[in-house]
């Protein structure tokens, strides 16, 4: 794990502090207790994906998504693609992926997304009726009161019937929406489009101020939560999921470059049609990016 215990400073993230430097160096100081053995002869390229996959695993676990609940991933960069992989590994039956980039949508399909949409043409929330979701308060009131009327017509006390239906999971599904963009305005767009009772999970890191309309989220009874990082157990589990073939993260690796090419790699990553994730190999010479074909 990229953490270093630096005396009075405690644990610091490697490469993000002067006291725990070495993010892009030939050698880096590692915490011996946080070194994990790579299992099953896993290749170095795949093992290097453990950290971003641990982030995705943490997001999926914290979301409490059920296998029967539709999951919607907004943004198919490396974070979103990792979330798609972990959702499918968790057994989620329906994963919808949304991105403007044709290349990213193609990668989302390779990662296991069941439905891929271009938000310029189709909202990722357009098919909510097909998934048994509720789109507005009026639908919820009519559904609830219709159920209430039917239960009152039975011999059993209606509240017992309601509890039984709730226990059996027969009430409307609650979709889980993963915001993996991290750009101001996206969270508000999701709130506007999300079906009732959705759970929104903020995975993308927005570094700027943003605005949302709480009243709209209240009327839809939305849950909004944010996630960060991972635990040592999730880091270990992500590594073993990759090694055991439960997660195939190779579609994310679109290029490899040496240390001399780090600057050009960041420039290349600006174009979503070119790359998703570029691995840095300190042993590789030259600044050219080697394209990976899958």
Pin down the residues of each PLM region.
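Glycine-rich phosphate/adenylate-binding loop and adjacent beta-alpha elements
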Residues: 1-35
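ADP-ribose/adenylate-binding Rossmann-like module
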Residues: 176-179, 192-210, 224-225
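Short helix-loop-beta connector
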Residues: 42-43, 64-70, 172
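A glycine-rich, Thr/Ser-enriched phosphate-binding loop motif common to dinucleotide/cofactor-binding enzymes
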Residues: 19-22, 40-61, 74-82
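Adenosine-nucleotide cofactor-binding segment
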Residues: 73-76, 88-185
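Residues in the short beta-alpha loop(s) of Rossmann-like NAD(P)-binding domains
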Residues: 100-101, 206, 230, 283
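C-terminal hydrophobic helical "lid"/dimerization subdomain
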Residues: 144, 163-166, 188-192, 232-294
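Rossmann-fold dehydrogenase core element
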Residues: 199-201, 212-252
């Amino acid at each position: 794990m990229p953490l270093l215990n630096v005396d009075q400073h405690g644990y610091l993230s490697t490469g993000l502090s002067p006291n725990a430097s070495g993010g892009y160096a030939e050698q880096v100081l590692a915490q011996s207790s946080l070194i994990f053995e790579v299992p099953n002869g896993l290749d170095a390229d795949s093992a290097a994906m453990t950290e971003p996959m641990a982030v995705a695993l943490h997001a999926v676990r914290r979301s409490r998504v059920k296998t029967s609940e539709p999951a919607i991933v907004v943004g198919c960069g490396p974070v979103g693609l990792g979330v798609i992989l972990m959702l499918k590994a968790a057994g989620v039956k329906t994963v919808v992926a949304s991105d403007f980039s044709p290349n990213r949508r193609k990668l989302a399909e390779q990662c296991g997304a069941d439905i891929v949409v271009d938000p310029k043409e189709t909202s990722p929330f357009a098919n909510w009726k097909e998934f048994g979701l509720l789109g507005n308060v009026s639908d919820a009131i009519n559904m609830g009161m219709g159920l209430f009327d039917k239960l009152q017509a039975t011999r059993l006390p209606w509240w017992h019937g309601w509890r039984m239906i709730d226990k059996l999971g027969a009430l409307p599904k609650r979709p889980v929406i993963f915001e993996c963009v991290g750009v101001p305005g996206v969270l508000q767009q999701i709130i506007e489009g999300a079906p009732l009772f959705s759970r929104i999970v903020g995975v993308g890191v927005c570094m700027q101020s943003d605005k949302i309309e709480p009243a709209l989220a209240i009327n839809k009874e939305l849950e909004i939560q944010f996630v960060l990082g991972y635990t040592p157990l999730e880091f270990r589990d992500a590594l073993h999921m990759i090694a055991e073939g439960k997660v195939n993260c190779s579609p994310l690796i679109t290029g490899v470059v040496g240390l001399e090419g780090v600057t050009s790699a960041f420039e290349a990553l600006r174009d979503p049609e070119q790359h998703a994730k570029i691995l840095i190999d300190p042993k590789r010479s030259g600044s050219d990016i080697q394209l990976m074909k899958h």
